[in-house]
Amino acid sequence: MGKYVVALDQGTTSSRAIIFDKEQNIVGVSQKEFTQIYPHEGWVEHNPLEIWSSQYGVLQEVLAKTNITADEISAIGITNQRETTIVWDKNTGEPVYNAIVWQCRRTAGIVDELKKDDEFAEYVKANTGLLLDAYFSGTKIKWILDNVEGAREKAEKGDLLFGTVDTWLVWKLTNGKVHVTDYTNASRTMLYNIKELRWDEKIINKLGIPTSMLPEVKNSSEVYGHTNLGGVGGVRVPISGMAGDQQCALFGQTCFEKGSAKNTYGTGCFLLMNTGEDMVLSKNGLVTTIAVGINDKIEYALEGSVFVGGAVIQWIRDELQFIHDAADSEYFAKKVEDNGGVYVVPAFVGLGAPYWDMYARGAIFGLTRGANRNHIIRAALESIAYQTNDLLTAMAEDAGCKLASLRVDGGASRNDLLMQFQADISNTQVLRPIITETTALGAAYLAGLAVGFWESKEEIATKWAVSKSYGPTFESAKREKLNKGWKNAVSRVKGWAE
């Protein structure tokens, strides 16, 4: 048994490789950003070959800079941006089109047509746990087949394969030998029946997707195949853990108990609550998804997705050029006592849960002559907490109880002003763990459990510990006034682009 597990964390803006030891210490990290492609308004793409080269590059780099040899690696786990859709030629290994990213809204028109069939929309929700939306993979595959020359003909001949990013990476790591996904990633395609645990023929046929394109669905923790680290003749290392980034974060936060929840503050924000073996269908705009599948035992989760979370700070930095570094946002936000009545609604690509409005667009409200750069920066930061609070409110109604506490992770969870405002506006205890790399840690856990590197979930759970706790300080009247202002702002951006 080797001394380490490697997590490959393929995110929306960068690829990372993180090495953990048995005590969950981070031994090494390598990261590489890659190109964001915006061909038209509302469209977002990545180059699948750049995803692969950046991910494989950081794997090689982290091993080199830590002087860890391949035979010291017990297993590789993969976590990935979900829903992002790649279609490639199985004979040449070449993608037929760029990866269509989860944020991309190009299939909104396809979704509108599908929504005209009320019975089908209800069927999708009841069987996939998802809502008909451009966010998920199904309509993205259809778009590629309908719009890339020769793609449909190739697909019908059985020459094309579909995969979310996890599937693509495993296929590349195994030199095209293994075409698989796991339960969690399958549950984000809008093609997978999460009750019966199978690809849903009714939905697949409605979208015109040949079943030969679809990967085999496996557990989130099992050996899928091996990769040669060090090239041909190198050490064969098992790839033995795989889950979507948000499910990995839930697992990495050791939210193993029914009712436990976490929020990840990344490019978007993603709130997940473990509902155990109960598949709870939301009445409040959330989606139902698979939390994890181990030994063919499925646990479900309620999920709310915010499309633009930390990305609003990138916008403040890159487009408005108010700050030089994302970390500066807290410094400038603290220069004013409050938002000065200013609200930023960052609906750049529509609104996710609980609104699900593909046609909403971003806006800044409440500007007066006294409003300055710092008010806008603060309002942008606060928008992340307001959107999360919308999810918490919906989740409490669906679950029938208020969350006692919220475990947090992701880059923006290190922002103390944001975390305190989250506790205040949500009237909830916010807990940041010592290890905030919970997404990568979850992938490492899943891989390690499959090969005996860690013995059990119980062993893992004992390692979770709080770094900082934030308690609510607002009076209820202040909280209600601020939330009312936010709701007013959101109401004005809905349907803007119709």
Swiss-Prot record:
It catalyses: glycerol + ATP = sn-glycerol 3-phosphate + ADP + H(+). Glycerol binds at residues 82-83, 135, 245-246. ATP binds at residues 12-14, 267, 310, 314, 411. Activated by phosphorylation and inhibited by fructose 1,6-bisphosphate (FBP). Key enzyme in the regulation of glycerol uptake and metabolism. Catalyzes the phosphorylation of glycerol to yield sn-glycerol 3-phosphate. Homotetramer and homodimer (in equilibrium). This is Glycerol kinase.
